[in-house]
Each structure stands twice: as structure tokens, then as C-alpha cells.
């Protein structure tokens, strides 16, 4: 089962409106951010968990500003709530792992993406994602 299939399954298992909006990802849907984070030395103890939580946060970003991969809804309010829920899901799982460095790095990504959207600078959001994923993975030269 792919990381995005696992994320969709978790949303369905929670029940409620998000479960109803959860869909299987398209074949070949990109989960590269989670895969990159999971492949780094900082995620070595729990790579599958890191892949899932990074992709949960990425899905939250896409629910807010783009095209989500495992959610389908025409209700903009539900999409925003889903995005917030997915941000919280990923950050909560990181906190449970005790990885405060990664919590900070991905919280910074969320803030930078909100700023980039407000300023209509999508390239800044993608740059923030690249920096954040490298930081979570431990491949960025930053201290942990």
C-alpha cells in the first residue's frame, strides 16, 4: 500500500465528513516529499511514519492551495477544514515521535506557504517545501 493510500485509509477510518471526501489517489500520484523525508538519516528509526506525516501535511497544503490527491470536495469550507486537520495530523505525529526539530521545520513550511499564497508567489511555497523536507530528512546541513 502506498503512503497516499495509507493516508486515504486513515482518513476513512476516522469517519465523518473527511471520510466521505477521501478518495484513492490517482495511479502515479506524487508522494516525493514524504519519500525524500523518509530516506534521510533523521527519519531512519521510523521511515514509514515520516513519509505518512509529511504527506499528510503536504495534502493539507494542497487542500488549502491546490489539488489534493486523496480528498475530493466542491465545498471550499470543507477543503479548508480538511487542510487544517491534515496539518494537525502530521504535526501531532511528529510530536509523538519527539522530533521537535521536524515540527519546527514543517510549521515553518506551513507559514511560508500561507505567506506565498497571500503574495501570489507559488515558487516560494515550493522552495519552502524543498527546504523543509531536507531539514526533516537531515540532508540540509542544519543542526538538529
Language-model segments: which ranges?
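Mg2+-dependent prenyl diphosphate-binding active-site environment of isoprenoid biosynthetic enzymes
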Residues: 3-144
Amino acid at each position: 500500500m502506498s503512503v497516499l493510500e495509507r493516508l486515504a485509509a486513515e482518513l476513512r477510518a476516522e469517519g465523518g465528513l473527511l471520510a466521505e471526501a477521501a478518495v484513492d489517489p490517482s495511479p502515479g500520484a506524487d508522494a516525493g516529499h514524504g519519500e525524500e523525508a523518509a530516506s534521510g538519516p533523521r527519519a531512519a528509526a521510523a521511515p514509514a511514519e515520516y513519509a505518512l506525516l509529511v504527506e499528510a501535511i503536504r495534502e493539507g497544503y494542497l487542500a488549502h492551495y491546490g489539488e489534493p490527491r486523496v480528498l475530493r470536495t466542491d465545498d471550499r469550507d470543507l477543503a479548508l477544514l480538511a487542510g487544517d486537520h491534515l496539518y494537525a495530523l502530521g504535526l501531532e505525529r511528529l510530536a509523538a515521535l519527539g522530533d521537535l526539530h521536524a515540527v519546527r521545520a514543517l510549521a515553518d513550511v506551513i507559514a511560508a506557504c500561507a505567506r506565498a499564497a497571500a503574495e501570489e508567489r507559488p515558487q516560494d511555497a515550493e522552495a519552502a517545501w524543498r527546504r523543509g523536507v531536507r531539514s526533516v530528512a537531515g540532508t540540509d546541513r542544519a543542526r538538529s
